Amino acid sequence: MLTEKDYCDYETCVALKELGYNEKSNWWFSKYLNEDSGQMELVHICDNPAHLNYDSWGIVPKDFVIRPSLYEAQKWLREEKGIIVGIINNFTTHEFDFYVSTWEEDICRGNKYSSYEDALQRGIKESVKILKEKKDE
């Protein structure tokens, strides 16, 4: 069963959206006005596939941010952007390391994460950061 740690966090989802991530999903982030506090709050929405998640043209509502699983984001980065995020376990420390690469070069690495999901989340964040920097050049 998937848990909260199996999905990208809000900041990563916003960055993925800016990079063009627009895959169909039943998981979203959206903001709503909390009438008690008068503040905008972030909510995580799960919808039934039978319900309308997209408008009649298949477009995500502008104020929604798609929330992919870590695997969905990892796969999209690999297939659409040519960025590979991999996880390696460290047998001596029982921790996980990530690496980010293309088919031609190793871009960056990170280590000492207590869970596979934490390492993958960080690797995806680093990938998105690198892609955004290249986009801004």
Give the role of each language-model region:
Residues 27-28, 76, 130:
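Tryptophan-centered motif/residue detector
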Residues 12-19, 72-75, 120-126:
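Short, hydrophobic/amphipathic alpha-helical patches that form generic packing surfaces
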Residues 109-137:
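Ampiphathic alpha-helical segments that act as solvent-exposed interaction surfaces
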Residues 14, 22, 32-114, 137:
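N-terminal segment of the canonical double-stranded RNA-binding domain
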Residues 1-29, 137:
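Short, extreme N-terminal segment that most often corresponds to the first beta-strand
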